[in-house]
C-alpha cells in the first residue's frame, strides 16, 4: 500500500459532493488515492469563509471518484474546492513530546500550549504485532490496589473492561492506576477520550494536574498523554481517535521499550461512531443497526493492544452497556477480547468502601492456579466464598438479628465485614480531599493479610482497624491506637 500511496502524493482532486461528514472527490485518471489515505482541503469558499479539514478515503467509487469521511465539521465546504492527496494515512506525533499534552484525532495540540517542535510522527493504521513478536507467557500486572490484585488480577498486555455508573469512583480509580504505573513501574500512560462529554475530559485534565500526573510547570516530568475526540465531533473523529491514542502508546512500547497503560473511555462510542460512518457510506446494516464490519473494526483495534518481547500495552476500557443489555452486539463483541472485568458497585460506594470494586462480580482469566499460584488462588476463592456467605446471611440478620445465627455463621459474618473493610484502601491521588496518605500494597502483603483474617488470627481486632489502610501491619498499628484512645 505504501508504494502506491507515495506515487499519488500531491495529486489534486476536486470536491464533487458533500453529504454531512461524507464527501466525494474526483481525481485525474490513474491518480486515485489509496483507501485510508488522508486528503487535505484548505482554502476559502465563494463566501470568503476559511475552510481547513482532513478527510480519510473510505471507498473508491468509479468514474475517478473516491468517498472520504471528514475528521472535523464540513461547515463552509462547497463543491469545486480543491482536495490534496497527502499520499499517506493520518499521522500523529509520538514519543516524549506528547507527554502532558492534549491532542485531537489528527495529533494537533488543543491545549493552547503551543505547537510541538521537531516531533516524530507515526501513521494511525498499522498491522497488529506478528505472532513471533508476542509475549505469550501470562504475567500478572501488579497495580498495588488490593481488591484488583487479589480477586481480579490484570494481565500485563491484557485488556480490562471497567464497568461503573456516575459517581462510583471510576475516574479516581483510573487516576490511581496511572499514578501507580508511573511510580512503581516507571511507565507512561495514554488516555483516549472517545465520544464522551467534553466537560468530563476537561475535568479529568484538571484533576490530573492537581494530582501531579501532569506537571504543568515542567511537561517533561508528566507521565500521561491525552487524545480526545468527544461527543460533539463528527463520527469520523470519534471512530479514529482510539487509533490515534493507540499509536502513541505503541511508540512507547516498541521504541522506548516501556510498559504502557492505555485508557479508552468509552469503547462503546468507538463502535457507535463506526456504525454512523457505515450508514453514511451506504453499507447494509447488520444486527440492531450496527455496521456489518463490527467484528473486524473492534478486532483491528483490540489486536494491536498486546504484550510484545519489547514491552506491553495494558488497556483499561470503560464499557457502556446500552439499556443494560449485555447481549447487545457492541458490548458482546468487546467482551470476547477482555481478559478481566472490574465492576464498580454503587452499594459499596454508599458504604464508604473505596475503591468500590465489587469483589463478587469482578472477574479475571488470570485467576487460576497455573498463573497466579496455589496460595493466591486459594486465598482469593476463600475471600469470595466468605463474602458470598455473608451476602446470603444478610436477609436473616435483617429479620432475626445477628444473635440468631450459629456460632460458625457469626464468625463468618465478623470476618466478612473485616474483609470488606480491608478491601478498601487510601489512594495517592485522593490525598488532597481525604487527608490520608496513599498506599501501594505489594501482592504478597495482600495475600498474607487476607490469609490472616480468614484463619481467625485477627478475630480479636476491632472491625474499624481494617478500614482504609494498606497492609496488615497498619491494621495492627491502627488497632493499638484505637485501644489506647479507648483507655484514655
Curated annotation (Swiss-Prot):
Pfam families: ATP-synt_ab, ATP-synt_ab_N, ATP-synt_VA_C. One of its GO terms (cellular component) is proton-transporting ATP synthase complex. Its EC number is 7.1.2.2. Gene3D superfamilies: 2.40.10.170, Bovine Mitochondrial F1-atpase, Atp Synthase Beta Chain, Chain D, domain 3 (1.10.1140.10), P-loop containing nucleotide triphosphate hydrolases (3.40.50.300). It is found in: Cellular thylakoid membrane. The keyword NAD does not apply. It comes from the Bacteria. Signal peptide: none annotated. InterPro entries: AAA+_ATPase, ATP-synt_VA_C, ATP_synth_F1_bsu, ATPase_a/bsu_AS, ATPase_alpha/beta_chains, ATPase_F1/V1/A1_a/bsu_N, ATPase_F1/V1/A1_a/bsu_N_sf, ATPase_F1/V1/A1_a/bsu_nucl-bd. SUPFAM superfamilies: C-terminal domain of alpha and beta subunits of F1 ATP synthase, N-terminal domain of alpha and beta subunits of F1 ATP synthase, P-loop containing nucleoside triphosphate hydrolases. Keywords: ATP synthesis, ATP-binding, CF(1), Hydrogen ion transport, Ion transport, Membrane, Nucleotide-binding, Thylakoid, Translocase, Transport. One of its GO terms (molecular function) is ATP hydrolysis activity. It is an enzyme of class 7 (translocase). ATP binds at residues 164-171. The keyword Membrane applies. Its main location: membrane. It catalyses: ATP + H2O + 4 H(+)(in) = ADP + phosphate + 5 H(+)(out). SMART domains: AAA. It is a peripheral membrane protein. HAMAP family: ATP_synth_beta_bact (MF_01347). Produces ATP from ADP in the presence of a proton gradient across the membrane. The catalytic sites are hosted primarily by the beta subunits. F-type ATPases have 2 components, CF(1) - the catalytic core - and CF(0) - the membrane proton channel. CF(1) has five subunits: alpha(3), beta(3), gamma(1), delta(1), epsilon(1). CF(0) has four main subunits: a(1), b(1), b'(1) and c(9-12). Belongs to the ATPase alpha/beta chains family. This is ATP synthase subunit beta.
Amino acid at each position: 500500500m505504501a508504494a502506491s500511496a507515495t506515487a499519488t502524493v500531491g495529486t489534486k482532486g476536486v470536491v464533487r459532493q458533500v453529504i454531512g461528514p461524507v464527501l466525494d472527490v474526483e481525481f485525474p485518471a490513474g491518480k486515485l488515492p489509496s483507501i485510508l489515505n488522508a486528503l487535505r482541503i484548505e482554502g476559502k469558499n465563494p463566501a470568503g469563509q476559511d475552510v481547513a479539514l482532513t478527510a480519510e478515503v473510505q471507498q473508491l467509487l468509479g468514474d475517478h471518484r473516491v468517498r472520504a469521511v471528514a475528521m472535523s465539521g464540513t461547515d463552509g465546504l462547497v463543491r469545486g474546492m480543491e482536495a490534496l492527496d497527502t499520499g499517506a494515512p493520518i499521522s500523529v506525533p509520538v514519543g516524549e513530546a506528547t507527554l502532558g499534552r492534549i491532542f485531537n484525532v489528527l495529533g494537533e495540540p488543543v491545549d493552547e500550549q503551543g505547537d510541538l517542535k521537531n516531533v516524530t510522527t507515526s501513521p494511525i493504521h498499522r498491522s497488529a504485532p506478528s505472532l513471533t513478536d508476542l509475549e505469550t507467557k501470562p504475567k500478572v500486572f501488579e497495580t498495588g490496589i488490593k481488591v484488583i490484585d487479589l480477586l481480579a488480577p490484570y494481565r500485563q498486555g491484557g485488556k480490562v473492561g471497567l464497568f461503573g455508573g456516575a459517581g462510583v469512583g471510576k475516574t479516581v480509580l483510573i487516576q490511581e492506576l496511572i499514578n501507580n504505573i508511573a511510580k512503581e513501574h516507571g511507565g507512561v500512560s495514554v488516555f483516549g477520550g472517545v465520544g464522551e462529554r467534553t466537560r468530563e475530559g476537561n475535568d479529568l485534565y484538571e484533576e490530573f494536574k492537581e494530582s501531579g500526573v501532569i506537571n504543568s510547570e515542567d511537561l517533561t516530568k508528566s507521565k500521561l498523554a491525552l487524545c480526545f475526540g468527544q461527543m460533539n465531533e463528527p463520527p469520523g473523529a470519534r471512530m479514529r481517535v482510539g487509533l490515534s491514542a493507540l499509536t502513541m502508546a505503541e511508540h512507547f512500547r516498541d521504541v522506548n521499550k516501556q510498559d504502557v497503560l492505555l485508557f479508552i473511555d468509552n469503547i462503546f462510542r468507538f463502535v457507535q461512531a463506526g456504525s454512523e460512518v457505515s450508514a453514511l457510506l451506504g453499507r447494509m446494516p447488520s444486527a440492531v443497526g450496527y455496521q456489518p464490519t463490527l467484528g473486524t473494526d473492534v478486532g483491528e483495534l483490540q489486536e494491536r493492544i498486546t504484550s510484545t518481547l519489547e514491552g506491553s500495552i495494558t488497556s483499561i476500557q470503560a464499557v457502556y452497556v446500552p439499556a443494560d443489555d449485555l447481549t447487545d452486539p457492541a458490548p458482546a463483541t468487546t467482551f470476547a477480547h477482555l481478559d478481566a472485568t472490574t465492576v464498580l458497585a454503587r452499594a459499596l460506594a454508599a458504604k464508604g468502601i473505596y475503591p468500590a470494586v465489587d469483589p463478587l462480580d469482578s472477574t479475571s482469566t488470570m485467576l487460576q492456579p497455573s498463573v497466579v499460584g496455589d496460595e493466591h488462588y486459594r486465598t482469593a476463592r476463600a475471600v469470595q466464598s466468605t463474602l458470598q456467605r455473608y451476602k446470603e446471611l444478610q436477609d436473616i440478620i435483617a429479620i432475626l438479628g445477628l444473635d440468631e445465627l450459629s456460632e460458625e455463621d457469626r464468625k463468618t459474618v465478623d470476618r466478612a465485614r473485616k474483609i470488606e473493610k480491608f478491601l478498601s484502601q487510601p489512594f495517592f491521588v485522593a490525598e488532597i480531599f481525604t487527608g490520608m496518605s496513599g498506599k501501594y500494597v505489594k501482592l504478597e502483603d495482600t495475600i498474607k493479610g487476607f490469609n490472616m483474617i480468614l484463619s481467625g488470627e485477627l478475630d480479636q481486632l476491632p472491625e474499624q482497624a481494617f478500614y482504609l489502610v494498606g497492609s496488615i501491619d497498619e491494621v495492627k498499628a491502627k488497632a493499638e491506637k484505637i485501644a489506647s484512645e479507648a483507655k484514655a
